[in-house]
């Protein structure tokens, strides 16, 4: 169980990245996909991670220390159109550097919004993740916002758009859909040396 999740620090640039020998489980996804809500749900706390009504609120890499054992790491959202070109470039460089130069990443949760067809940026991120030797899981957020039939249809659209062979796990922060499953996965990932 993820009973003890604490915010540790934020990195706004490469120099600010946390140096640690602890495992890191990473969240990636476009702006406003629900990464902060995902963390708050796992922590069972409403305001641990700041949830923004405006997309692109998280512009830093945020580290959360879990059970005094490993880090849950929230990467900045990508693809937000109101970011300046320079902000997009900085965000992209920070994400790339963090993943490329980090041997402590044990798993990546790739979050997509179940209500919408994946964007070109989602497809690029998926292809990029495939090129890495890091295991990842696709999480389809906001699953409570659509009915069961539409949920299956949209998962199929996500799979076809990304050409994904992996399982896609529907998730809802509001209705706690598959929270137990994801906690179980995190525990398995963390126990696997």
Residue ranges and their predicted role:
Residues 57, 70, 77-80, 115-117, ...:
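Conserved nucleotide-binding/hydrolysis micro-motifs of P-loop NTPases
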Residues 25, 32-33, 39, 62, ...:
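Structured catalytic cores of enzymes that bind and process phosphorylated ligands/cofactors
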Residues 2-14, 145-193:
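Canonical P-loop GTPase G-domain recognition
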Residues 88-92, 119, 179:
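Amphipathic alpha-helical transducer elements in NTP-driven molecular machines
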Residues 93-167:
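Conserved C-terminal guanine-recognition region of P-loop GTPase G domains, centered on the G4
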Residues 66-105:
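Conserved nucleotide-sensing/catalytic segment adjacent to the nucleotide-binding pocket
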Residues 21-22, 40-43, 85-88, 123-127, ...:
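Short, glycine/charged-enriched secondary-structure capping and boundary segments
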Residues 1-82:
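Conserved G1/Walker A P-loop phosphate-binding module
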């Amino acid at each position: 169980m993820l009973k003890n999740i604490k915010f540790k620090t934020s990195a706004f640039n490469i120099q600010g990245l946390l140096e640690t020998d602890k495992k890191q489980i990473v969240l990636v996804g476009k702006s406003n996909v629900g990464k902060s809500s995902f963390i708050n749900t796992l922590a069972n706390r409403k305001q641990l991670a700041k949830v923004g009504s405006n997309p692109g609120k998280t512009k830093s890499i945020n580290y959360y220390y879990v059970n005094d054992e490993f880090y849950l790491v929230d990467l900045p959202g990508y693809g937000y159109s109101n970011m300046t070109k320079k902000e997009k470039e900085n965000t992209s460089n920070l994400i790339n550097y963090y993943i490329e130069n980090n041997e402590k990443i044990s798993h990546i949760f790739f979050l997509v919004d179940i209500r919408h067809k994946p964007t070109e940026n989602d497809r690029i991120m998926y292809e990029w993740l495939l090129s890495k030797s890091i295991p990842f899981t696709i999480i389809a957020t906001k699953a409570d916002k659509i009915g069961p039939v539409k949920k299956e249809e949209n998962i199929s659209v996500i799979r076809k758009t990304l050409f994904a062979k992996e399982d896609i796990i529907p998730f809802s922060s509001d209705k706690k859909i598959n929270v137990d499953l994801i906690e179980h996965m995190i525990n398995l990932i963390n126990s696997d040396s």
